[in-house]
Amino acid sequence: MPHDRKNSSRRAWAALCAAVLAVSGALVGVAAPASAVPATIPLTITNDSGRGPIYLYVLGERDGVAGWADAGGTFHPWPGGVGPVPVPAPDASIAGPGPGQSVTIRLPKLSGRVYYSYGQKMTFQIVLDGRLVQPAVQNDSDPNRNILFNWTEYTLNDGGLWINSTQVDHWSAPYQVGVQRADGQVLSTGMLKPNGYEAFYTALEGAGWGGLVQRAPDGSRLRALNPSHGIDVGKISSASIDSYVTEVWNSYRTRDMVVTPFSHEPGTQFRGRVDGDWFRFRSGSGQEVAAFKKPDASSVYGCHKDLQAPNDHVVGPIARTLCAALVRTTALTNPNQPDANSAGFYQDARTNVYAKLAHQQMANGKAYAFAFDDVGAHESLVHDGNPQAAYIKLDPFTGTATPLGNGGSTEQPGTPGGLPAGTGALRIGSTLCLDVPWADPTDTNQVQLATCSGNAAQQWTRGTDGTVRALGKCLDVARSGTADGTAVWIYTCNGTGAQKWTYDSATKALRNPQSGKCLDAQGGAPLRDGQKVQLWTCNQTEAQRWTL
């Protein structure tokens, strides 16, 4: 299921925290045969946090009915007959694992959340014939305000399992999520860098955004509110993002923003230009198809209100892309959106500091730091169409977390791995191979993709020393760089870390351990002849799947 075509639930989930659970057809995948995915799959929760007791809640919606699931995976609708005044919900808690222990429950087909709390149970209420009132801890009177808790979002249906870590509402207790495939491999995401949990708070407060941080009565940090909530309760100023939006609106009075919302449909484009206070977008035929009023700070941080994105194939995708460009502050620097180069995200001084820091502290750089962080596939989500099991690992608040399963997309820089020895083409896609342009072995000749031909420029020898060689030279990361977008070229073999590679047979990634990043086709899909090759954060996309 392409990230940019799925029905994103992020906006829905963010809205729910303030009021009532009314889940739409969120995270719905391409349907597979009904027999492909059983009614429940095992979910193992491991407690590496060093804290407890842990209480679990599996809450969500099935066929338009909201409810909860017990440890055996049985779904229970919330009681009906409730009026507009909220009443306590039945206790849906499941006893979680103690420190250093694991608990396995059954995860049913739902679109919802798995909550977990530390030390005490959470309070939930129902209203209006069985709708759930979610925690809204931006309100100091919320009964869960002083409880340490977090959650993961998931959808399990006939199309498989989608599960993600999220920071859309707040940054709090660290965790990883994972899915086991039929071949036994575990795809995972959400792991922080060493000491990343506290580093986030320190940097946030140092940047003047400390008003978002909520503390317990004993002074310990509980969470940092997402600015989408903080702006509405006066915890941060709107001045900086307002200034940025004004500059963006003025910039596009005299030039077009070109939105290409679907990576697999490069010919589908919309051009936008500002007229008065309205950003008006046209189709290829010149017809106006969407218009957005100049948004206030709440609309930008929350990707809603003035930037509301309906579940359609025109207005919604344009709104999502425009909001992502504003949140990541790339709208001024790149008129072609979405911006494919994450190295340029959050560089403006007026940027969303919360989102910037959330991505910085993730081991794989992926986060769900705002509602449409999935624009361009930068979200912390894993999916499999035939899931065998799901995992949540509650990580330590300090120190270094252990990667979930085989590491998946959270594999740490420097983790050793094998490179199968041999000689042959390095294939990508159906017809392309890694190629030395013009078969020229000159140092610093940047490698590319080219139609497979079997010539010497496409014959790569993989050594037991981790090198990949062609034409007597080594595949080399330019100047030992570690940043996204660093060129990969051929260079005289010298034994440095810039010339070492490992191969993950599960994800088909060629990874440079020194940088912790992967060999990547510049610009991503669609793959094409002449496309240059670079270093990029490992993301398991088509642009990083190499066949030896």
Swiss-Prot record:
One of its GO terms (molecular function) is carbohydrate binding. One of its GO terms (cellular component) is periplasmic space. Residues 1-36 form the signal peptide. GO terms for biological process: cell wall organization. The keyword Cell wall biogenesis/degradation applies. Pfam families: Glyco_hydro_64, Ricin_B_lectin. Transmembrane segments: none annotated. Residues 472-548 are annotated as: Essential for the lytic activity, but not for the beta-glucanase function. It catalyses: Hydrolysis of (1->3)-beta-D-glucosidic linkages in (1->3)-beta-D-glucans. Residues 38-396 form the GH64 domain. SUPFAM superfamilies: Ricin B-like lectins. InterPro entries: Glyco_hydro_64, Glyco_hydro_64_fam, Glyco_hydro_64_N_2, Osmotin/thaumatin-like_sf, Ricin_B-like_lectins, Ricin_B_lectin, TAT_signal. The active site is at residues 153, 169. Its main location: periplasm. Residues 422-548 form the Ricin B-type lectin domain. It is an enzyme of class 3 (hydrolase). It is found in: Periplasm. Predicted to be exported by the Tat system. The position of the signal peptide cleavage has been experimentally proven. Coiled coil: none annotated. The keyword Cell wall biogenesis/degradation applies. Residues 37-430 are annotated as: Possesses beta-glucanase activity, but is unable to lyse viable cells. Belongs to the glycosyl hydrolase 64 family. Lysis of cellular walls containing beta-1,3-glucans. Implicated in the defense against fungal pathogens. This is Glucan endo-1,3-beta-glucosidase.
